[in-house]
Regions:
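Non-catalytic, C-terminal membrane-associated alpha-helical segments of glycosyltransferases
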Residues: 227, 246-297
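Short aromatic/hydrophobic "clamp" motif used to bind/position activated sugar donors
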Residues: 93
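Active-site donor/metal-binding and catalytic loop motifs
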Residues: 199-236
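Conserved donor NDP-sugar-binding/catalytic core segment of glycosyltransferases
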Residues: 105-135
């Protein structure tokens, strides 16, 4: 059983004091059970520009063994996680996104009793389906939720590595830092999964999910999606065989059909995007749009 843990949460314009308080209560219970157990929670603010968020999160510093570190400049998802690794005091690092909820009272216990050096807990899709029926992020995540239970994730352990909710030994985190060359949004976790695979590092997948119940609006999510396509284009060679979209794009390229993708995007791209950012998005168009958009890069 793990005797010490650093919980590391990168944060940008998100109020996460409630999440930290929940985690601290669970960690303190472990300490009360075993006084040898040591823990800390570090929240690193990656250049937030909302003063109300910063002031609210300052309350984290009042919780035992918790600290809120304010970084004046936004350095990106990879660099802020590497910063947290350097700040951590203990040998096991639990990385969590800031916009999630922990509802399982045994969440921390499930991690500290895991035996592997890399453990991925997974994601549960929360929220009111009636209220979110026209949110494209919710529709996308909900449609793929069952495919990402621990059993299915374990079948492709490295390709299914995600940074939303995972624990890694500090030694491995330092040996395999996140790729800070990734400046756009997305794929830093896919890249790390590939690097772990190259060194035959086992990734254990368990059913210990956090809950995603905070969804950006459709326009914001589509902007992030387009940004992720730029990342995929920039690191296309490195991410081959780790992207379904690249697999299908290569089929078009093999048969010299990529100009067709470009032509379809020029003709229908705005129409499709207007649907996806609108009030009644059609999920079937989402992956089509990604492929078409990628074809223009």
């Amino acid at each position: 059983m793990t005797k010490s843990i650093s919980v590391l949460i990168p944060c940008y314009n998100s109020k996460c004091k409630g999440l930290v308080a929940t985690l601290q209560r669970q960690l303190n219970k472990e300490y009360e059970t075993d006084n040898i157990f040591r823990y800390e929670i570090i929240v690193a603010d990656d250049g937030s520009d909302r003063n109300d968020v910063i002031e609210y999160n300052r309350q984290i510093n009042m919780l035992p063994h918790c600290r809120y570190v304010i970084r004046g400049k936004n350095v990106g998802r990879a660099a802020i996680r590497n910063f947290l690794t350097k700040e951590a005091a203990y040998d096991n690092l639990l990385f969590l996104d800031c916009d999630i909820t922990v509802a399982n009272d045994l969440f921390i216990r499930n991690y500290i009793t895991a035996e592997s050096n890399v453990v991925v807990g997974g994601l549960e899709i929360g929220g009111d389906s009636t209220l979110l029926c026209n949110n494209i992020r919710y529709l996308y995540e909900k449609a793929s939720e069952k495919a990402h239970n621990a059993c299915n994730r374990a079948k492709a352990e490295h390709k299914e590595f995600r940074t939303t909710n995972f624990m890694i030994s500090r030694q491995l985190a330092k040996q395999f830092p996140f790729n800070e060359n990734i400046k756009w949004y997305g794929y830093e976790d896919v890249m790390m999964g590939k690097e772990l695979a190259a060194e035959n590092v086992h990734i254990e997948h368990i059913d210990n999910p956090v809950i995603l119940d905070d969804y950006e609006d459709n326009a914001t999510f589509m902007a992030k999606t387009e940004e992720a396509m730029h990342t995929l284009k920039e690191f296309e060679d490195e991410l081959k065989e780790y992207s379904t979209l690249l697999h299908y794009y290569d089929i078009f390229r093999k048969y010299h059909l990529t100009p067709i993708l470009y032509a379809i995007y020029i003709t229908f791209g705005n129409v499709i995007k207007n649907n996806l950012t609108g009030n009644k998005p059609k999920l079937i168009l989402f992956n089509i749009y990604k492929l078409l958009y990628f074809g223009t890069l």
